[in-house]
Amino acid sequence: MTQDATPSRIPTLAVTLGDVAGIGPEITAKMLLGHDELRQRARLLVVGDAAVLAQAVQAVGGDPARVRVIATPAEATNQPGSIEVIQAGPSLAHVPPGQLSAEAGDGSVRYVTTACALARDGLIDGIVTAPLNKAAMHMAGHKWPGHTELLAHEFGVKTFSLVLSAGDLYIFHATTHVSLRQAIEDVNPQRMRAVLRLAGSFARALGRADHPVAVAGLNPHAGENGIFGTEDAEILAPAVAQANAEGILAAGPIPADALFPQAVRGKWKFVIACYHDQGHAPFKSVYGDDGVNITVGLPVVRVSVDHGTAFDIAGKGIAREDSLVLAAERAAQLAPGWHQVWETARSTTGG
């Protein structure tokens, strides 16, 4: 952790460029050119490709001369309107927008691993990620299901969760980028206990241990007393009971169709979804792209946009940067206290 991540100094955040064939470059350019208020809360630099960013700046009507290559985070001046880039690998400026490319997939992974190395060396306090494309990443031979799993590997952690957030709502996911069939298999006692501990430690670190963690039922009607499946009674309910016995305020399982409307209305601040679409579908129905994706369980804060690469509009300069701005704001907010989040999570889950 850098000395900037203290109450009196702003944190240093690395923005990874994502897939260069997607909208990552242009939303990064728009954020850094048009939202200088962010620089009062964080020192911002990009890990990616300077030439690609120069193209993106030009596409959105800016001056490509604003892009400057730096060698280390310490060189970042954070001046208004500046785009300071740590060049990670060869230029991919020749990659056409809107097309799947192994080169772009490889680059997107390289930007993340470079940022993780900077974090491990204590040179940055957090990572903000523009979207990568899973198909392109796989074309390049990187078989990670997504950003979250790649980051967990880079930091050597086994217990982590993808968390969607908007305002004061945090939706943890017990499983993420696997088939629904596999997700049901993965909702086992060990995983549910681990995610409950992770969510509880996160709530405690935020000073909200008095807010219960609500667990969504896996089956319709949370199983309806075993009529629609036994997992809720045999796996989820015992995990909730154990969490309460350990001092983690928890509730559930609660039928998902009741829980998520209640959460949106403010009854629940911390929710655990059993599988990807159980959490993502209601969240995006309400918040659209006006939310962020936080990875809880890493030693540094990582916040991402909650949308994809949008190949259909890439390179046209029309993509909205709102979610990336929200991600940077949330990372800047969480970074100064993230050490407590990490230590609390590690002590309760074993990493």
UniProtKB/Swiss-Prot annotation:
One of its GO terms (molecular function) is NAD binding. Its EC number is 1.1.1.408. Substrate binds at residues 147-148, 284, 293, 302. It catalyses: 4-O-phospho-D-threonate + NAD(+) = dihydroxyacetone phosphate + CO2 + NADH. InterPro entries: PdxA_fam. The keyword Transferase does not apply. It comes from the Bacteria. A divalent metal cation binds at residues 177, 221, 276. The keyword Transport does not apply. Pfam families: PdxA. Keywords: Carbohydrate metabolism, Metal-binding, NAD, Oxidoreductase. Its cofactor is a divalent metal cation. Binds 1 divalent metal cation per subunit. Belongs to the PdxA family. PdxA2 subfamily. Catalyzes the NAD-dependent oxidation and subsequent decarboxylation of D-threonate 4-phosphate to produce dihydroxyacetone phosphate (DHAP). Can also use 4-hydroxy-L-threonine 4-phosphate as substrate. Homodimer. This is D-threonate 4-phosphate dehydrogenase.
